[in-house]
Amino acid sequence: MFALPVLALALAGCEREPESRGESASTERTRPNILLIVADDLGYSDIGPFGGEIATPTLDQLAKEGLQLTNFHVLPSCSPTRSVLLSGMDNHRAGLGTMGELKTPEMEGHPGYAGYLNFEVAALPEVLRAGGYHTYMTGKWHLGHSEETIPHARGFEETFILVPGGGSHWSDLKPVSPTQTMMYRRNGKVVEALPEDFYSTRYYTDTMLQFIERNHEDGKPFFAYLSYTAPHDPLHAPREYIDKYKGKYNEGWDVLRAVRLQRLKDLGIIGKDVEPFPRLASVKAWDDMSDDERLNAARDMEVYAAMVDYMDEQIKRVFDYLKEIGEYDNTMIIFISDNGANGALPTAYPGQTDEYLRSFDNSLDNRGLPNSYVETGPGWAQASMSPSRMFKAFTAEGGIKAPFLVKPPGRLADGGTMNHSLFHVRDIMPTILDLAGINHSEEFNGRKVRPMQGRSVLGLFEGKVKLPYKEASQVGYELFGLKAFFDGDWKILWMPPPFGPGDWELFNLKQDPGEVADLSAQHPEKLKEMVGLWEQYKADNGVLDISLDLSDKVK
C-alpha cells in the first residue's frame, strides 16, 4: 500500500518541478487531501456526538458521514500530544518528555526532553511535502520557537502560527503570564502587529482558506493542519456568541455533569451502569457558592461554549469551500482534541503573578471580552470530561481521553457508526502516510531518523475492519512523573497525593471508565504483570525519574 518512497538527501526538499503540469495534475488528483483539525483543551463530552449540549452542527454532520472513535487517547497536555501526532512515536522519543516551559536542569542533554520536536524524527509535514503534498498550517504550534524548530523549518510551506502554547484570542498580544511572549509568525517571519478585528479562530480559518485557494488548481494534493487555540484559556469569544448561551449553565457543574453522563449512556458511548468519578473535594458544590461566585462561574462556561460554537461554524466554512472546489469527497478529515479539558487555574502558568492577573477587567459583563482573563476551572472541567477522573495534565482518563471523528475520502457505506476500540494518537501519522501512499524512511534530509512506533489503522478508518492491529491495545504513559499503562480494557495508573495514593492502581475501563474502583487488591497478578510492562516501556523510551509538583497548580 505504500507506493511513494520518501526521498533522502537529494530530494528531501521536494522542490523538483514535474516535467508536465498537466501530467502532474492528472496523476496527483487521484491522491487524497488531508485536513487535520485539532481543538485545544476541548473536553470529551463537549460536542454533540459525545453528548454535549453546545451547538456543533458541523461536527454532528461529520460524525454522521464518518466514524466516531469513542476510546481515543492522547497525552495529558498540549505539546506532548502534538509531538506524538506529528511524529508517530512516543513523546519521550520525539523530544517532549516534558513541556518546554517546564524543563528542569536534570533534563538537559536528553534528546527526549529537548522541549521541542527534535531532529530524531521526520515530522509529518516534512514527509508529506517530500512526497508531493502541499503542506499548510494555521494556529497553535507549541513545538519549538527557534528558527530551526518552527513549522516553516519542519516541512510546512505556508504557515500562520502561534508559537507558544496560548494567550489572548484578540489582537492585543497579551500572554498567559508576564514572563511569556505572545508571538505569531507567518511563513517563519515574526508578525509585529495583528489586525484590530483579529479573533484567533476566524483568522486561522481565513488564512487556511487562502492557502488552499492559492494552489488548488495545480493538481497537487494538500495537507492542511488547522490547529485552533479554542477553547484554551483565557476564554474569549464574540459577545453575540456568548449571549447565545446566557442562562444555559445557571444550574451549575454538578447538574451539567449528570446531564452529560446520561447522554453518554443514551448514545451507547458508555454503559448504563457507569458511575462517574466523584466531584473533587476542592470543588465547591454549586449550592454552597455565593450568588456572585455562581454568576461568574456560569458566565465563564457561557464563554467556553461560545468558543466551541464559533469554532464549529468556522469548520463549516472550510467544509463548504472544499465542496465548492470539488475537493470535499477527496479529503480525509480528522477532528480531535489535544488533551482533556483544562481544570487548572491561571496561577498554574510559569511566571504568573497576582499583579498581572489583577490588570484584567473580569467584571461580569466583560468576562470573555477583550482585556479579560477567565477560565473554566476544575468544576466545569470535570463536567466536560464526564464521567472521567481529573482533567488536563493528569494521566487519569480525564487528562488523556479525547473526542475523535474521521471521514475518509469518499463516503462510508456505514457512516455514522461508532467504534469503541482503544486507539492512540501515535497511529494517526502512519495512517495518513498509508493513505497518501508514502513510505517513512530511516533517513530524511541527510539525517538518520527513528522509525515510527505507531502503525496504520487505515482499514479501521475506511470501515473495512472493526479492530486496529493487536499491539494497539498496549500503550504506556509518563508526563510530569504521572504514569499509566493500558493493556486492552485494563489500565494501571500512578499519581501522587493528593490526586492519587502514590502507588499503582488497577482499573477495568470497560466496566469502570470513571476509574472509581481500584482492583489492585483483587487482581495482584494482573497488576504485577502490567507494572512490568510499564517498566519495559520506561526503558524502551528513555523515561527519566523526574516528577513535577502539581499540588499548587490545581485547587
Residue ranges and their predicted role:
Residues 11-13:
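C-terminal motif of bacterial Sec signal peptides marking the signal peptidase cleavage site
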Residues 15-32, 39, 43-44, 68, ...:
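Long, internal low-complexity/basic segments
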Residues 21-67, 130, 141, 340, ...:
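Active-site-proximal N-terminal segment of extracellular/periplasmic enzymes that hydrolyze or transfer
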Residues 30-33, 85, 145-169, 201-280, ...:
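Active-site regions of oxyanion-processing enzymes, predominantly non-cytosolic
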Residues 44-136, 154-158, 168, 175-186:
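Active-site segment of extracytoplasmic enzymes that catalyze sulfate/phosphate-ester chemistry
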Residues 48-54, 68-92, 97-102, 137-149, ...:
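Short, solvent-exposed turn/loop segments enriched in Gly/Ser/Thr/Pro and often Arg
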Residues 147-155, 236-237, 320-411:
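Histidine-centered active-site microenvironments of extracellular/periplasmic hydrolases
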Residues 149, 157-167, 370-398, 411-421, ...:
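C-terminal cap/loop subdomain of S1 sulfatases and analogous C-terminal strand-loop tails that border
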